[in-house]
Amino acid sequence: MNRNFRLSVALDVDDLLMSCTEYAIQLANEKYNFTPPITIYEASGWGKLGTRVDVIHEFFGKAEFYETMPVLEGAKEFVSKLSQKAEIFISTAVPPEFMGIRAKRIREEFPQIPADHIYMGARKDKITTDILFDDALHNVLNSNAQYPILMRRPWNEESTGMLAVNTYDEFLKVVDVIAQSYAKQDEQPILSEPSIVVLVGPSGCGKSKLATRILKNYPQFEKPISYTTKDATATEENEWYHYVSLETFRDMVESGEMFQSTMYAGHGYGSVKSDVESILAKGKHVITTMDICGAMSLKTHFNNVTTIYVSRQKKAIIETILRKNSSIKDKANRIMGLDFCERNRTLCDYVVNFNYYDEAYAKLVEILKLEK
């Protein structure tokens, strides 16, 4: 479908454009001298948690807090770049007595956003745009936007299935992909040397099974070993994952060692850029399996990425998940995210229907233009 108008994007403010939670934590540490200091990872949920981090809520009722909230690093450049791609709206929840302060700060810090594009209120489901970008899970779940996108923060790590990003650059790449999905495009070339093929889909869709068969039959493909946080029921090293602790995983992300990371069903998954580059340097193709978030991260860092969504009947996926040797909580998280996963298929370059294994594999081989 061709469109003669720009995409519309609604942006949150708190913890997306301006530092809210982390700033409040900083103020709390300065005022109360906590030992050890409160960290952002202690804000592991929305609202009050019954822990010491609840002290930050005292700052949310002070005008000075909203007057001095710092703009997040890179936020101004992000809005400037986004304004060239889409029509920007602000959708922000703020107490009524501080709305004037919030509006003034937005106009001062982000002059690209027109005053009549600023909406203040908690009912973000009343805003209809192509894309919503927010860090609050409930806003993403209730959004009427065609593409609600979650900004990953410690308080939404448990969320699964919905499209989520870790950085502004990843979001801008997703906007490009969404824009391209609206336009008629010629069939893109597959497997130009060297290339990356990503099989996308929820847990239990069959993507790993298809990738394994490709790796077995076509030696020109190689899979980088990914990193994932430890699951008490799956701690053995294998050919797909290195298992690390959540603390180690976070350190790898924050140090930049991982160029791509995502959370799925409460577990972290990530890749090291040098692992991908070493395969490409050998003249081989990379094949890997990821959720849509990981796939978009790859597209941010590499130009030669083809995404293929593996679609399977929901009943079959649930049966596969229930057979997994994992915790009940893990299974529940994966099942709850299935509908959101299916919505993301339009962002992929191709779709393979996994109704029957051999037929799905044959379709994948056809898409990749491999010799049978």
Regions found by a protein language model. Give the residues of each.
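Phosphate-binding P-loop
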Residues: 187-194
